[in-house]
Amino acid sequence: MCIRDSTDSAGYCLVTSAEKEGMRLITVVLGTKSVNARAEASQALLNYGFRFFETHKLYDTGTALTNARIWKGSTENVQLGLDRPLYATIPRGQYKSLEASMTVDNQIIAPVSAGQSLGSVLVRLGDEVIAEQELVALQAIGEGSFWQRIVDEAMLYFE
C-alpha cells in the first residue's frame, strides 16, 4: 500500500506499508526533495526494519495462561487468557530475553462473565514494557449455592 503527496512547503511525502514473513511495517517519509528520494528513503526504512526486527506471536486467543481463585462461585477457579492474540515486534535475536508477568485482580467474586477483564499480562524486554494486554475470563462462572456463598463470605472476612 502506498500513499503519496507533495507540496512546495512540505516536499515529497510517502506512507508505505509492506508485509514479509508475517511482519507488517509502515514507513512515513516527509519532506524529501524528489520522487526518487522519497522512494529510496522509504525502501531504506523497510529494509532496515525487516533486517533488524522480527515479530513473534507470544500467546494465542483462548489459551489458558493462569487460573484465579473465584469467591462465591459455582467453581473455585476461573481460567484466564486473552481475547485476541498477543504479538511483539523486537530486535532480532532477543526473543529469549523476553519476560512476561501476570497480574490478577484480588478477590474476584462471582458471577463472572466470559471475556470479563480480571487482570493483565505485561511483556518486557529488559526494562522496557513492549506489550500489555488484559487477561479475561475464558468461561462464565455463575454464583455458587447459598451454602457456598456463606462459606466464602466467612473466609473472605478472615483474609
Stretches with model-predicted labels:
Residues 4-159:
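Domain-terminus/edge residues, biased toward the C-terminal soluble/receptor-binding domains
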